[in-house]
C-alpha cells in the first residue's frame, strides 16, 4: 500500500466521520477534499461509498440498545412499531426523489461551485431557523407555570422521539429531500426541518441519527451494487483504512453532538458553512485553488 494513498484514505475517512452527522454536509466536504487530494476518480467514488458505510455503522453501534429494543418489540409493542413506521415514512420521500432525479443531480450539481453555494444558502437557513427559535422564546425543558408560557411562546411540542406521529415523521422526511442537493447536508436538513416543525433540538438531532441508518445504508448497498464491476481486491487495504477511520471519527462525533445540542444552538455551524462557502468561491474565482467540476 502506498503511503501517500493511505494518507489520503485516513484524511478522507476522518472528513467523512466528522461531517456526516454535523449540519455541514459530508458530501460537500468529500467533493472538495477529493478535488484537493486528486482522489475523485472512479476508485475515489467507490471509496466514498465505503467510508459512508463506516460512518453509519458508528451510529448503529452508539444506538445499538435502542435499535435492539425496537427490533425485539416489532411483533407486539406499539411504541416500537410506531417508531419503526416513523423511520420508514420519513425515509420514503428522499428515496423516491433520489431515484427520479439522482442522475441529473450527479451530472449537474456535483461540483465545487454548486457545493459552495449550497453551503452558503444552508448556513443562512440555519441562522434564520435559530433566529425564529429564539424569537419564539423557545425553552428546552419548561417546568411548572413556565410550561404554559412556553407553549404560548411556541416552544417545541415534541420533547421525545417516542412522541413523534406519522405526520411529524413525514414532514421531517420532506425536509430531508433538500439534502439531495450536494452541500446542503442531510443532517442539517432533517434537524432544522424538525425544529421548524415543532421538534426540540435534541429530538430533531436524535431522530436525524436514526433516519440516517436506512437512507445511507440503502444508498450504500445500491451504489456498491452498481459499481460492482469496478471493485478490485487490490483496493481492499485502502478501503479498510478509510472505513476504520470513518467509523472511529463518526462515533466520537455522534457522542459529542448529543452533548453539544443539550446546551448549544447551531449558529456556529451556520457561520462555518457561510465562511467555508465564501472561501471556496473566492479561491475558485481568484485562481488560488484549481477547483474543477
Curated annotation (Swiss-Prot):
One of its GO terms (biological process) is response to antibiotic. The chain crosses the membrane at residues 3-23, 43-63, 85-105, 109-129, 178-198, 203-223, 238-258, 269-289. It holds the Pfam family BacA. InterPro entries: UppP. GO terms for cellular component: plasma membrane. It catalyses: di-trans,octa-cis-undecaprenyl diphosphate + H2O = di-trans,octa-cis-undecaprenyl phosphate + phosphate + H(+). The keyword Repressor does not apply. Its EC number is 3.6.1.27. GO terms for molecular function: undecaprenyl-diphosphatase activity. The keyword Zinc-finger does not apply. It is found in: Cell inner membrane. Keywords: Antibiotic resistance, Cell inner membrane, Cell membrane, Cell shape, Cell wall biogenesis/degradation, Hydrolase, Membrane, Peptidoglycan synthesis, Transmembrane, Transmembrane helix. It is a multi-pass membrane protein. Catalyzes the dephosphorylation of undecaprenyl diphosphate (UPP). Confers resistance to bacitracin. Bacitracin is thought to be involved in the inhibition of peptidoglycan synthesis by sequestering undecaprenyl diphosphate, thereby reducing the pool of lipid carrier available. Belongs to the UppP family. NCBIfam families: PRK00281.1-2, PRK00281.1-4. This is Undecaprenyl-diphosphatase. The lineage of its organism: Bacteria, Pseudomonadati, Pseudomonadota, Betaproteobacteria, Burkholderiales. The gene is uppP.
Amino acid at each position: 500500500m502506498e503511503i501517500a494513498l493511505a494518507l489520503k484514505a485516513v484524511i478522507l475517512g476522518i472528513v467523512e466521520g466528522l461531517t456526516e452527522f454535523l449540519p455541514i454536509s459530508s458530501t460537500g466536504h468529500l467533493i472538495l477534499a477529493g478535488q484537493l487530494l486528486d482522489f475523485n476518480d472512479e476508485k475515489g467514488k467507490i471509496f466514498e461509498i465505503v467510508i459512508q458505510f463506516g460512518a453509519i455503522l458508528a451510529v448503529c453501534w452508539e444506538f445499538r440498545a435502542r435499535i435492539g429494543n425496537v427490533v425485539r418489540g416489532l411483533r407486539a409493542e406499539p411504541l416500537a412499531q410506531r417508531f419503526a413506521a416513523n423511520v420508514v415514512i420519513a425515509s420514503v420521500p428522499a428515496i423516491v426523489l433520489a431515484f427520479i432525479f439522482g442522475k441529473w443531480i450527479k451530472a449537474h450539481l456535483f461540483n465545487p461551485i454548486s457545493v459552495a453555494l449550497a453551503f452558503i444558502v444552508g448556513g443562512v437557513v440555519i441562522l434564520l431557523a435559530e433566529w425564529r427559535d429564539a424569537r419564539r422564546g423557545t425553552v428546552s425543558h419548561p417546568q411548572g407555570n413556565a410550561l404554559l408560557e412556553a407553549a404560548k411562546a411556541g416552544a417545541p411540542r415534541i420533547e421525545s422521539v417516542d412522541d413523534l406521529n406519522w405526520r411529524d415523521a413525514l414532514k421531517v422526511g420532506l425536509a430531508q429531500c433538500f439534502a439531495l442537493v450536494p452541500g446542503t447536508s442531510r443532517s442539517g436538513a432533517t434537524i432544522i426541518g424538525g425544529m421548524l416543525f415543532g421538534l426540540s433540538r435534541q429530538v430533531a438531532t436524535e431522530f436525524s441519527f436514526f433516519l440516517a441508518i436506512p437512507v445511507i445504508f440503502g444508498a450504500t448497498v445500491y451504489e456498491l451494487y452498481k459499481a460492482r464491476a469496478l471493485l478490485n481486491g487490490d483496493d481492499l487495504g485502502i478501503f479498510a483504512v478509510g472505513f476504520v477511520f470513518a467509523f472511529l471519527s463518526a462515533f466520537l462525533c455522534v457522542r459529542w453532538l448529543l452533548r453539544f445540542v443539550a446546551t448549544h444552538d447551531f449558529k456556529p455551524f451556520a457561520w462555518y458553512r457561510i465562511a467555508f462557502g465564501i472561501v471556496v468561491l473566492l479561491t475558485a474565482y481568484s485562481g488560488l485553488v484549481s477547483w474543477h467540476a
